[in-house]
Amino acid sequence: MAEVTAAQVKELRERTGAGMMDCKKALNEVGGNMDKAIDFLREKGLAAAAKKEGRIAAEGIVEAYIHGGGRIGVMLELNCETDFVANTDGFKQFARDIALQIAAAKPRYLAKADVPEEELEHEKNILRAQALNEGKPEKIVDKMVEGRISKFYKEVCLLEQEFVKDPDKTINDLVLEKTAKIGERIVIRRFTRYEMGEGIERREEDFAAEVMKEMNR
């Protein structure tokens, strides 16, 4: 039987919201088959997020966050299934936390799939050139690039970013946790971030660091 990889466990966790050990056990039980592992977790009542994937999340709120007298602004649409959940303090606080994350960490895209192919290829070409300039053997360069591109995703994709308040979790982890806890599908649909003077040459001011301090109070 093929050995279950960490990447498989991570993917199963992202798709189901189940714990790491439960995901590893499920994959071992079914010989590494992802679909069968999801079914295994559902049968055990452990795949909270997977059971809700097909449900429509059309309610929710638009959260607006303004920092530092109007120097940074964020608008975020966070969806759920019912207006009851949308009006709870917990859901509103979650939207606030995500808006603060966007203000502090400056993501440009929501998910990996949103990164334009030409930008991704451009980044890979730069990483490939860097590896070659470091004197790395050409036969391992592509593997190195794939490893380094994951860091790029963590910088530019909101769902891949480490949560500023708890770096052991990604934003995607938080969404899955909230889905399991609330019992409804939760979706970050879209966001926009503005920073005063963005694109204009001016003296350096780290507004994002200020937001991080506010989040950790």
Curated annotation (Swiss-Prot):
Spell out the molecular function terms from Gene Ontology.
translation elongation factor activity
Q: Which SUPFAM superfamilies does the UniProt entry name for this protein?
A: Elongation factor Ts (EF-Ts), dimerisation domain, UBA-like
One Pfam annotation reads EF_TS
Q: What PROSITE patterns does UniProt report for this protein, alphabetically?
A: EF_TS_1 (PS01126), EF_TS_2 (PS01127)
Q: Which GO terms describe its cellular component?
A: cytoplasm
Q: Which family does it belong to?
A: Belongs to the EF-Ts family.
Does the keyword NAD feature in the UniProt annotation?
no
Q: Function of this protein?
A: Associates with the EF-Tu.GDP complex and induces the exchange of GDP to GTP. It remains bound to the aminoacyl-tRNA.EF-Tu.GTP complex up to the GTP hydrolysis stage on the ribosome.
Compartments (UniProt record): Cytoplasm
Species whose genome carries this gene: Desulfitobacterium hafniense (strain Y51)
Recite the UniProt keywords alphabetically: Cytoplasm, Elongation factor, Protein biosynthesis
Chain intervals for the UniProt region annotation (Involved in Mg(2+) ion dislocation from EF-Tu): 82-85
Q: What is this protein called?
A: Elongation factor Ts
